[in-house]
């Protein structure tokens, strides 16, 4: 029994000792000086390609570390003195002597005497269990110098057992994983978890956004419990989702290697670390472990007025179809984001009338407190004369990449104030819906202003009897896509007013199918099948779209197929074409349609041989490794051959996200009297009307009316020039990504990716009673420039790499209808012109003394134009139309 007790006592003692050893942290010996060599290297480049000529620099030095004080109660809490000496700054890339900006420059001439002295001044590190708990340095030292010291201190971060934990070093507070063996520790930092002091922003849509991939690993070699070497490799890759070859790479390396151990200073006595630090140097103070923000100082940089003078000629209306317009827009945007309210107002008040709309686009797109305040003071919404500028401001708000609650509150204030133009009043409310959605997407749905606007829009349609105001609120809800609005939209979908029904149903079509409840499905089925009353054809067609795109049941699909043959003549052809398009383009409902078509009652020759001119067709605009772009064209005619609805959509898909890039809808009604024809059932009393509606980058814009009423129609017909009516024109900030990447070395990389689009969308409608012909056109002109740059500015040296691409393109959609005989001839054309495409990359290094090295390269190509293929029936019709015209 005694032997057993003794054995248990020995085992317990051994386990306790082992546990103590496992939990102990690394320690430095007393009276020892550990002499290390250290280097921190930065390289900037694209992810692939040669490293020759890449911008970057290397800072190398000696680092002496010694134990100053050890907590008598906690042996693993140690105060270390760290001193950097023999500093060298040189190029990290392979440069010829001619292109090496560091050649012939001393460290003091590069850093400056004050910075060099500060860098070589000793600092203190509180090291506990291998973790940096605090760092002590002189408060007055430059931020860049303190950050470099933080980078050196972070090399000591380690632990002697494996595990995961949140810990802070120079680059932020991150989840870190350790894998420890007797002689080696591998420290892997999960950079996607890091919380830093500087918050950036990014575009709400992943399709237009930027993707990042980062990695950080430290390999520490131990000898007798002392760090023999530590090597860090950290990479950050940022790429534009729409074109991943437009990408940048930040490579940061650090190395700490033990050279020798010498006799060092004796340990200082003291009870606590604060007292010991103060006794050593009363100028020491705790400065934190994480790198601090460095205020950029730009000597000789142009101010806002200088920038505006340099770019304004490129922003005149005649230049908007050229790539120089969005390029100048982005240059101006960067300057605006640094400018004060007073500077911005000065430029606004001294701008020509022709360039002012483009300046308003840029000021609003800047999305700073100063720019928003300046533009709101500049615009007077009580005056009708400023309609163009006011609408450009509102559209720029709608396209905002990262809107704030302040911007939404500003629009709410405008809507509640005096507004001179009813069109502007409509646009304000419609755009508030777009801002509401973007704020909710980034988790800000419960902010006070957001809640207030949400309540306003949900109550809006029922709060007024004015038709235009009801449409305004419904369009705002179409932008907002609030889940709470689904029942309200379903209610208005069954309205007796066709415009209400169309807006409500097309809004429901934009929702995630998960939110289309069984009750809503019953509603759209009632509308399509006219179970309770007769609806206009375009309303029924929109209802069919919702049915087929919202995870339909077998019976829903079967009933849609069975309806073909019992619809108005042109709608029969439209629905048949719609079903065939689902099959051909393999849409989500494709398999269910195939299953239903096995039933011969649903699928027979009589049903699938309906003739007419209406059609629906989908196709690919572009298919690349980065993005898939698709289009669809739907066109519905009345039985008399007059256009009822033309709908063109363009979508972009990337990174598992979908962007509704463009929708242009032309609607017409009540035009049968022009050709002495009979209106279709349910449309006999419709007022003559034609208009155009556009949705651009997920934002529904205010519809444009061509004419309304018979008298307006006749006056427009006799005065119509055939020139298209502008729907939207201006400069849009598509991509907008900004972030600061704090590196473990203490350096800070600033990343800015912006994409600017100059766009001009117009549409027109022409009638010729003499030739019994009508023509509708949608013209899209645009120039796109996307630029991404990453810079590291250390006050004493800066390095940067910039990538980008640009293009100019046009896309026209023309529909010609000849209704001199029946069946009437319809020709649809969708043409893309040959357009240029350019990719660019530039690199730069610069010293404050003025020495600069830079390179620029570009690659140009011409992308051939094409006419997008539609169905064979359309091709046959176009031949007949042009043969007759000839």
From Swiss-Prot:
Gene Ontology biological process: cholesterol homeostasis; lipoprotein metabolic process; phospholipid transport; plasma lipoprotein particle assembly; triglyceride transport
InterPro entries noted in UniProt: Lipid_transp_b-sht_shell (IPR015819), Lipovitellin_superhlx_dom (IPR011030), MTP_lip-bd (IPR045811), MTTP (IPR039988), Vitellinogen_b-sht_N (IPR015816), Vitellogenin_N (IPR001747)
GO-annotated cellular components: basolateral plasma membrane; endoplasmic reticulum; Golgi apparatus
Induction: By elevated dietary lipid levels in the intestine of the juvenile fish.
Record PROSITE patterns: VITELLOGENIN (PS51211)
Keyword Endoplasmic reticulum attached: yes
Endpoints of the signal sequence: 1-24
GO molecular function annotation: ceramide 1-phosphate transfer activity; lipid binding; protein heterodimerization activity
Superkingdom of the source species: Eukaryota
UniProt-annotated location(s): Endoplasmic reticulum
SS bonds (residue pairs): 174-194, 440-445
Record-annotated Vitellogenin domain positions: 28-662
Coiled coil, from the record: none
Subunit comment: Heterodimer; heterodimerizes with the protein disulfide isomerase. Interacts with apolipoprotein B.
Role played: Catalyzes the transport of triglyceride, cholesteryl ester, and phospholipid between phospholipid surfaces. Required for the secretion of plasma lipoproteins that contain apolipoprotein B.
Protein name, UniProt field: Microsomal triglyceride transfer protein
């Amino acid at each position: 029994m005694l032997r057993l007790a003794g054995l248990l006592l020995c085992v317990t003692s051994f386990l306790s000792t082992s546990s103590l050893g496992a939990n102990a942290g690394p320690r430095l010996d007393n009276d020892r000086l550990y002499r290390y060599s250290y280097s921190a290297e930065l390289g900037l480049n694209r992810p692939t390609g040669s490293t020759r000529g890449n911008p970057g620099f290397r800072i190398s030095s000696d680092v002496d570390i010694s134990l100053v004080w050890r907590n008598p109660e906690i042996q693993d809490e140690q105060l270390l003195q760290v001193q950097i000496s023999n500093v060298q700054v040189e190029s990290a890339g392979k440069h010829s002597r001619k292109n090496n900006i560091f050649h012939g420059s001393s460290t003091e001439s590069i850093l400056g005497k004050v910075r060099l002295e500060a860098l070589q001044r000793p600092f203190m590190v509180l090291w506990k269990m291998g973790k940096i708990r605090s760092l002590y340095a002189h408060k007055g030292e430059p931020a860049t110098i303190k950050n470099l010291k933080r980078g050196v201190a972070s090399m000591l971060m380690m632990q002697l057992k494996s595990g995961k934990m949140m810990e802070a070093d120079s680059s932020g507070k991150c989840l870190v994983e350790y894998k420890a063996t007797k002689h080696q520790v591998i420290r892997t930092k999960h950079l996607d978890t890091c919380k830093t002091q500087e918050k950036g922003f990014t575009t709400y849509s992943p399709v237009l956004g930027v993707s990042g991939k980062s990695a950080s690993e430290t390999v520490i070699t131990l000898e007798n419990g002392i760090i023999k070497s530590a090597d860090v490799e950290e990479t950050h890759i940022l790429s534009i989702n729409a074109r991943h070859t437009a990408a940048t790479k930040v490579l940061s390396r650090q190395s700490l290697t033990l050279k020798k151990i010498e006799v060092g200073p004796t340990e200082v006595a003291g009870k606590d670390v604060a007292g010991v630090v103060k006794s050593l140097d009363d100028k020491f103070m705790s400065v934190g472990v994480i790198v601090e923000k460095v205020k950029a100082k730009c000597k000789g940089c142009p101010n806002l007025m200088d920038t505006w003078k340099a770019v304004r000629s490129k922003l005149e209306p005649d230049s908007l179809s050229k790539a120089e317009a969005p390029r100048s827009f982005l240059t101006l945007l960067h300057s605006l984001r640094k400018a004060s309210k007073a500077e911005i107002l000065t430029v606004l008040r001294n701008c020509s009338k022709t360039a002012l709309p483009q300046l308003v686009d840029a000021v609003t797109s800047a999305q700073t407190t100063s720019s928003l305040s300046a533009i709101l003071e500049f615009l007077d919404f009580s005056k009708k004369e400023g309609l163009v500028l006011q609408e450009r401001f509102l559209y720029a708000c709608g396209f905002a990449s990262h809107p704030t609650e302040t911007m939404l509150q500003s629009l709410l204030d405008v809507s509640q104030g005096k507004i001179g133009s009813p069109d502007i009043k409509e646009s304000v409310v419609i755009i508030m819906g777009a801002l509401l959605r973007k704020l909710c997407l980034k988790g800000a749905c419960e902010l006070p202003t957001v809640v207030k606007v949400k309540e306003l829009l949900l109550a809006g349609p029922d709060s007024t009897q004015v038709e235009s105001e009801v449409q305004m609120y419904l369009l705002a809800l179409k932008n907002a896509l609030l889940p709470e609005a689904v029942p309200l939209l379903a209610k208005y979908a069954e309205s007796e007013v066709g415009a209400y029904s169309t807006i409500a149903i097309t809004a429901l079509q934009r929702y995630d199918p998960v939110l289309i409840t069984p009750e809503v499905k019953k509603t759209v089925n009632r509308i399509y099948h006219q179970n309770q009353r007769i609806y206009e054809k375009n309303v029924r067609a929109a209802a069919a779209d919702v049915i087929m795109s919202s995870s339909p049941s077998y019976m829903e699909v079967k009933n849609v197929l069975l309806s073909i043959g019992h619809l108005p003549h042109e709608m029969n052809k439209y629905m048949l074409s719609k079903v065939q398009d689902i099959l051909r383009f393999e849409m989500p409902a494709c398999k269910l349609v195939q299953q239903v078509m096995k039933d011969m009652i649903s699928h027979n020759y009589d049903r699938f041989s309906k003739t007419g001119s209406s059609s629906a067709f989908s196709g690919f605009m572009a298919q690349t490794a980065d993005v898939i772009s698709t289009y669809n064209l739907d066109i519905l005619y009345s039985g008399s051959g007059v256009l009822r609805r033309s709908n063109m959509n363009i979508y972009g898909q990337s990174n598992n996200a979908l962007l509704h890039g463009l929708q242009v809808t032309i609607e017409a009604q009540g035009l049968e009297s022009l050709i002495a024809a009979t209106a279709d059932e349910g449309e006999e009393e419709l007022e003559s009307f034609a208009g155009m509606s556009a949705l651009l980058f997920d934002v529904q814009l205010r519809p444009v009316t061509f004419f309304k009423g018979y008298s307006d129609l006749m006056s427009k017909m006799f005065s119509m020039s055939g020139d298209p009516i502008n729907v939207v024109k201006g400069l849009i900030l598509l991509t907008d990504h900004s972030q600061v990447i704090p590196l473990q070395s203490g350096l800070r990389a600033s990343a800015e990716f912006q994409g600017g689009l100059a766009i001009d969308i117009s549409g027109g409608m022409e009638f010729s009673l003499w030739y019994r012909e009508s023509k509708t056109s949608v013209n899209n002109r645009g120039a796109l420039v996307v630029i991404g740059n990453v810079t590291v500015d250390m006050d004493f040296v800066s390095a940067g790499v910039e990538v980008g691409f640009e293009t100019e393109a046009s896309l026209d959609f023309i529909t010609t209808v000849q209704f001199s005989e029946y069946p009437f001839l319809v020709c649809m054309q969708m043409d893309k012109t040959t357009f240029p495409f350019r990719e660019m990359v530039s690199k730069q290094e610069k010293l404050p003394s003025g020495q600069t090295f830079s390179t620029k390269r570009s690659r140009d190509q011409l992308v051939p134009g094409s006419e997008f293929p539609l169905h064979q029936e359309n091709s046959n019709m176009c031949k007949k139309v042009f043969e007759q015209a000839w």
